[in-house]
Amino acid sequence: MRVLSALLASTALLGGCATPPAPDGPPTGGNSNDCAVIAAIAREHYRFNSTDNRPLPIRFEGDYAPRCDWSRYGLAFQPYDPDQPGDPRERVRWVSFARPVYDGRGAVVETSIMHGPLAGMGYECRVVSGIAAWTVPEGACRNTWVS
């Protein structure tokens, strides 16, 4: 009888682990923290704001394209358009972000900024989750390339 009870209990536990998430659960294709992590880098590393240092057009690496409500984070990003009409020098001004990689300490994000032809820098930024928000500790972004 004990063996049967133990077998039934372990079967129920294993079955619960194998149950897929409910349809209204979080999406599996991305992380709901991505927008907040990117916004933290934009505000704290690049010092973008809505008044005197407005963000450059934003672009993402590869097929990564999170849908974010940037105004929620006090930012006003416009999407990068390489075919934008007008001054061609404006088409080489952008900030880009790769998909955040999460670990036990927070997230790491590859990011870069181009201010114009041959005037850009790449970084790898460590972002940590604080009590109220994601933050970029002082010195947590290291240069990865310069043009």
Segments and roles (model prediction):
Residues M1-C17:
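Sec-dependent bacterial lipoprotein signal peptides
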Residues E124-A133:
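Short beta-strand segments and strand-loop junctions that repeat across beta-rich extracellular domains
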Residues C17-M121, A140-S147:
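Flexible low-complexity loop/turn motifs enriched in small/helix-breaking residues
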Residues S5-L8, G86-R91, C125:
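Residue-level signal for the start and early helices of compact helical domains
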